[in-house]
Amino acid sequence: MLVWLAEHLVKYYSGFNVFSYLTFRAIVSLLTALFISLWMGPRMIARLQKLSFGQVVRNDGPESHFSKRGTPTMGGIMILTSIVISVLLWAYPSNPYVWCVLVVLIGYGIIGFVDDYRKVVRKDTKGLIARWKYFWMSVIALGVAFALYLVGKDTPATQLVVPFFKDVMPQLGLFYILLSYFVIVGTGNAVNLTDGLDGLAIMPTVFVAAGFALVAWATGNMNFANYLHIPYLRHAGELVIVCTAIVGAGLGFLWFNTYPAQVFMGDVGSLALGGALGIIAVLLRQEFLLVIMGGVFVVETLSVILQVGSFKLRGQRIFRMAPIHHHYELKGWPEPRVIVRFWIISLMLVLIGLATLKVR
């Protein structure tokens, strides 16, 4: 919005030309989302407390979590609000990639909101029925994937980028739709599963978004894309603005979500952020990179799959409790230790993921 306005005002004052610089807009996008999130935080927490929108805690969970019962949840609303406002202000409104991310972000946010609302207001511990949750998540993911396939068919936008191999970028054909679906829905659920401790999900999300900001910048720059042997995608540069907005909103939320948390993001935040990371990976053709950089989310999800599978097949559990962060809690690790160690692992994985772009 402001970019469009600046383009019309630059003929009156050349200083408005600064709005055309991607680096400048990335920085102010981050700061805008950060300040909106910090401003909304106390007001959102007070409002959620007044409405008695408190966290529901499992009776079979770690005893240390019982004290969290009643802590305001659905704080993801302020994350999404911060991201959307910042992106609309600083990204080019004509960029289709930006709108793809916003559709998934808002769509998954609505699904998460309904799920949280049923849990918190209607006191339904199961929330939105699983089949309906997956149905609507699938509708959004398949809709976006199909639209992208129709537009980008037989172009670099539908190639598969394979790490470590600079000349291996096969055309996916219709498999592009299926892969995109699994990445978007899978990442949405993976971040949702990770969101079980104070600040555990938001910081890896920030790290991955920051990593993708660098990848988006390189992908949207023909010289760097050729240098790194990744597809050049002319719309990818604007995803830098989206990624930095996620970073800013995430850091602002962490101010209130750090241990001991004053507010939880709820499904409205975790599903939306996960879906956003998934569609960003799809748009940048970096699904494999997401698996590496988002390794914490992958391990959390695998721990649940292995736990359920083992119990159904053998009648035995592999972990004391899944997702795996609860396993370490039940082993006696203090919650802050689990959180910070997962943060460190996440940062390392993002750096390793970025390094794979050059190792080809």
Swiss-Prot record:
GO terms assigned for molecular function:
metal ion binding; phospho-N-acetylmuramoyl-pentapeptide-transferase activity; UDP-N-acetylmuramoyl-L-alanyl-D-glutamyl-meso-2,6-diaminopimelyl-D-alanyl-D-alanine:undecaprenyl-phosphate transferase activity
Q: Which domain of life is it from?
A: Bacteria
Q: Which residues lie on this side of the membrane: Periplasmic?
A: 1-25, 93, 153-167, 220-235, 284-287, 359-360
Q: In which pathway does it act?
A: Cell wall biogenesis; peptidoglycan biosynthesis
UniProt xrefs under Pfam families: Glycos_transf_4 (PF00953), MraY_sig1 (PF10555)
Reactions catalysed, as given in the entry: UDP-N-acetyl-alpha-D-muramoyl-L-alanyl-gamma-D-glutamyl-meso-2,6-diaminopimeloyl-D-alanyl-D-alanine + di-trans,octa-cis-undecaprenyl phosphate = di-trans,octa-cis-undecaprenyl diphospho-N-acetyl-alpha-D-muramoyl-L-alanyl-D-glutamyl-meso-2,6-diaminopimeloyl-D-alanyl-D-alanine + UMP
Give the EC number: 2.7.8.13
Give the InterPro entries listed for this entry: Glycosyl_transferase_4, PNAcMuramoyl-5peptid_Trfase, PNAcMuramoyl-5peptid_Trfase_CS
Membrane topology according to the record: Multi-pass membrane protein
Topological domain ranges for the Cytoplasmic compartment: 47-71, 115-131, 189-198, 257-262, 309-337
Location of this chain's protein in the cell: Cell inner membrane
Q: What class of enzyme is it?
A: transferase
What are the entry keywords? Answer: Cell cycle, Cell division, Cell inner membrane, Cell membrane, Cell shape, Cell wall biogenesis/degradation, Magnesium, Membrane, Metal-binding, Peptidoglycan synthesis, Transferase, Transmembrane, Transmembrane helix
Could you say which cofactors this protein requires?
A: Mg(2+)
Can you tell me which residues the record assigns to a coiled coil?
Answer: none
Gene Ontology CC terms: plasma membrane
Record field: transmembrane? 26-46, 72-92, 94-114, 132-152, 168-188, 199-219, 236-256, 263-283, 288-308, 338-358
GO terms under biological process: cell division; cell wall macromolecule biosynthetic process; cell wall organization; peptidoglycan biosynthetic process; regulation of cell shape
> Which NCBIfam families does this UniProt record tie to the protein?
mraY
Q: What does this protein do?
A: Catalyzes the initial step of the lipid cycle reactions in the biosynthesis of the cell wall peptidoglycan: transfers peptidoglycan precursor phospho-MurNAc-pentapeptide from UDP-MurNAc-pentapeptide onto the lipid carrier undecaprenyl phosphate, yielding undecaprenyl-pyrophosphoryl-MurNAc-pentapeptide, known as lipid I.
Entry's family note: Belongs to the glycosyltransferase 4 family. MraY subfamily.
Q: What is this protein called?
A: Phospho-N-acetylmuramoyl-pentapeptide-transferase
Q: What is the lineage of its organism?
A: Bacteria, Pseudomonadati, Pseudomonadota, Gammaproteobacteria, Enterobacterales
